[in-house]
Regions:
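Short, surface-exposed coil-to-beta transition loops
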Residues: 31-35, 57-61, 82-86, 104-108, ...
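Short, hydrophobic/aromatic-rich segments at coil-to-beta transitions
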Residues: 13-17, 42-49, 70-75, 91-99, ...
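Helix-adjacent hinge/juxtasegments
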Residues: 51-86
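Tryptophan-centered short beta-strand motifs
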Residues: 16, 28-30, 73, 129-134
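Conserved Ser/Thr-centered positions that define the repeating blades of beta-propeller domains
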Residues: 123-126
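Beta-rich strand-turn-strand
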Residues: 112-116
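Short, solvent-exposed loop/hinge segments that bridge or flank secondary-structure elements
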Residues: 15-46
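N-terminal helix-cap/turn-to-beta initiation motif at the start of protein domains
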Residues: 1-15
Length: 143
């Protein structure tokens, strides 16, 4: 039986085309394309597997779960560089946010969702959230 709060994430399930743009770490005008699949692991977690083609394939995985005791969603992140991170997550109506506040730097993801599209932006802060710089825009379009 799915947790009622996790069931609210059902709209993320499916196959998505991805577009990454306006990334500070790429040449101006560069646009990347990829895809993501979101599916349930049992009835307890969501798994997002994403891939982008750049000079070589770039992959990452998110596992989304929930703590009933503190009423929070959590995202575990891992990518093909071996990077592992933990984000807090909220889904409030059509706004999807993820936030990481770690000693090395902070990151945030803010997206607006509709049934077939998610427009999101990621930012980073190297001064504990006092100032933020844009990382990139990412768009999900349901296949």
């Amino acid at each position: 039986m799915k947790n009622d709060e996790l069931a609210k994430l059902e709209g993320l399930v499916g196959d998505w085309d991805l577009t990454l743009s306006d990334a500070w770490f790429m040449e101006p005008g560069w646009v990347g394309h990829g895809h993501a699949t979101v599916e349930w692991i049992g009835e307890a977690f969501l798994h997002l597997h994403g891939e982008f083609e750049r000079d070589e394939r770039s992959t990452w995985d998110w596992v989304i779960g929930r703590s009933d005791a503190n009423e929070r969603l959590t995202v575990l992140y891992h990518d093909d560089r071996g990077v592992c991170r933990v984000f807090g997550m909220t889904l409030d109506g059509d706004e999807w946010t993820m936030l990481r506040q770690d000693p090395d730097f902070h990151q945030r993801f803010v997206g607006k969702m509709s049934a077939d599209r998610i427009e999101a932006r990621t930012d980073a802060s190297e001064d504990a959230g006092k100032t933020w710089r844009k990382d990139f825009d990412i768009t999900f379009v349901r296949r």
